[in-house]
């Protein structure tokens, strides 16, 4: 079976980064379109309450994806390091564990979500005006949790063995199916939020079928056969060690969005709808930078496993330069096109007015935001569970959420709007400090190995 050792070990760094990151960035662009589709077509109903309801429910969907990242990012990091250490059998055990782990957890989460639906609706801040729409959307999303988690996990698992293109194809299939079904179910059939949720789940099922077919055709170095399932020998703990911080990062992000929405609800449903649209628009900037940095994680993991610090640092520095250049260009595009971006989703005058201010606020940290994601993915690629966990808790738990309360109390609605960029800059400083420390300890690790 062909592996990607030449790509990981010998290909010039710019080409290796492009080979791994470009398909991942395209996948993230697909995710942007995927996430924008529901809001866009719901917006065509001309009903701000439905837009607000989907915005309120989105963090729950993101939590399901975050739980998929537990196995996806954790598994990808463990697989790339195992391949770097020439332990192919271990990599197969890891992929099989992630397959059945993501499906099993998905079933459990689906059952708990359906049973606790009213509690969830209360926690996300649904008002009397939006709770009905939010309930319709979440009921379908909850049932589809196993498919969301499996497709999220395996989009990352494929990258762990260097199959970024195949990961991209799976994402693309899911998005195309979603975009085709959205206008039919939302507008033609008039199903509103229920139709948006159904289209999303069917798209995830299509992606799952592609990933399963890819493995069953023998195209992969890895395995999803139950005979290769193994939890012992540090496999479950190795996946969880990186997967839990990665998952926790996304869960805290979703929880922070819930807190943000609850703060905005105090100023009416219109700011909630506007922030939902602004954040959807800003996904273009955020997810492309995440795509670049997620794409290089297997390169980091492989070369860390192979003790090749020189190549690891070359990958890190080159990716950092690209992220700043790309972030600056994307920021300028967003500022110039801010009104058009908001009006793409909804043309309500009050929502557009709030939305423009929110888009500009979110761009304040965008040029350097890629550095944060680069540090996070480098730490995860190196398999450093504790530093990854510390950075995760700092970014969302200890910085952003408290800032929402503090700035809301000090500056009102403007404080809530500008909490995100303020938190981003503080998080970037923390991330750089942690990464610098890890690179220094890597020098000591190599000295001990040579001794």
Predicted feature residues:
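Transmembrane helical elements of multi-pass membrane transporters/channels
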Residues: 19-38, 140, 174, 203-207, ...
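Small-residue-rich hydrophobic transmembrane alpha-helices
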Residues: 51-111, 148-167, 274-332, 336-338, ...
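Residue-level signal for short hydrophobic patches within transmembrane helices
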Residues: 10, 14-33, 37, 60-67, ...
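Short alpha-helical transmembrane segments in multi-pass integral membrane proteins
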Residues: 1-21, 79-146, 188-244, 300-365, ...
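Short runs within selected transmembrane alpha-helices of multi-pass transporters and secretion channels
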Residues: 141-159, 167-175, 196-209, 290-293, ...
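Alpha-helical transmembrane segments of multipass membrane proteins
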Residues: 36-40, 111, 119, 153-157, ...
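Helix-terminus/linker motif at the lipid-water interface of multi-pass membrane proteins
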Residues: 29, 33-51, 121-128, 184-191, ...
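Residue-level hotspots within pore-lining transmembrane alpha-helices
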Residues: 30, 34, 64-68, 108, ...
């Amino acid at each position: 079976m062909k592996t990607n050792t030449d790509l990981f070990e010998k290909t010039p760094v710019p080409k290796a980064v492009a080979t791994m990151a470009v398909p991942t960035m395209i996948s993230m662009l697909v995710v942007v379109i995927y996430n924008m589709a529901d809001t866009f077509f719901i917006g065509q109903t001309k009903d701000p309450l439905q837009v607000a309801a989907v915005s309120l429910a989105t963090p729950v969907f993101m939590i399901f994806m975050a739980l998929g990242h537990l196995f996806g990012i954790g598994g990808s990091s463990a697989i790339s390091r195992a391949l770097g250490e020439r332990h192919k059998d271990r990599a197969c055990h890891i992929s099989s564990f992630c397959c059945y782990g993501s499906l099993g957890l998905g079933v459990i989460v689906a059952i708990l979500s359906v049973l606790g639906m009213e509690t969830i609706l209360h926690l996300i801040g649904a008002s009397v005006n939006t709770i009905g729409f939010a309930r319709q959307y979440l009921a379908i999303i909850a049932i589809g949790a196993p498919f969301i988690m499996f497709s999220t996990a395996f989009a990352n698992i494929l990258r762990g063995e260097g199959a970024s293109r195949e990961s991209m194809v799976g994402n693309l299939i899911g998005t195309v199916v979603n975009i085709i079904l959205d206008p039919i179910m939302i507008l033609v059939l008039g199903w509103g939020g229920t139709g948006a949720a159904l289209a999303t789940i069917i798209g995830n099922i299509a992606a799952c079928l592609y990933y399963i077919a890819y493995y069953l055709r023998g195209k992969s170095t890895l395995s999803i056969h139950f005979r290769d399932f193994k939890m012992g020998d540090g496999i479950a703990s190795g996946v969880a060690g990186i997967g839990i911080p990665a998952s926790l990062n996304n869960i805290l992000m979703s929880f922070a969005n819930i807190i943000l929405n609850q703060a905005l609800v105090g100023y009416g449903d219109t700011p909630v709808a506007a922030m939902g649209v602004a954040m959807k628009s800003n996904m273009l900037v955020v997810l492309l930078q995440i795509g670049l940095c997620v794409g290089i994680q297997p390169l980091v993991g492989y070369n860390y496993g192979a003790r090749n610090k020189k190549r690891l640092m070359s990958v890190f520095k080159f990716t950092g330069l690209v992220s700043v250049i790309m972030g600056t260009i994307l920021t300028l595009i967003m500022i110039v096109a801010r009104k058009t971006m908001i009006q793409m989703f909804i043309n309500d005058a009050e929502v557009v007015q709030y939305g423009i201010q929110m888009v500009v606020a979110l761009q304040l940290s965008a040029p350097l935001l890629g550095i944060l994601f680069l540090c996070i993915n480098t730490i995860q690629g190196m398999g450093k569970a504790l530093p990854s966990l510390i950075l995760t808790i700092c970014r969302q738990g200890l910085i952003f959420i408290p800032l929402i309360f503090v700035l809301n109390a000090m500056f009102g609605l403007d404080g809530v709007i500008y909490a995100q960029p303020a938190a981003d800059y503080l998080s970037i400083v923390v991330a750089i400090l942690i990464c610098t420390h890890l690179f220094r300890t890597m020098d000591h690790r190599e000295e001990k190995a040579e001794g």
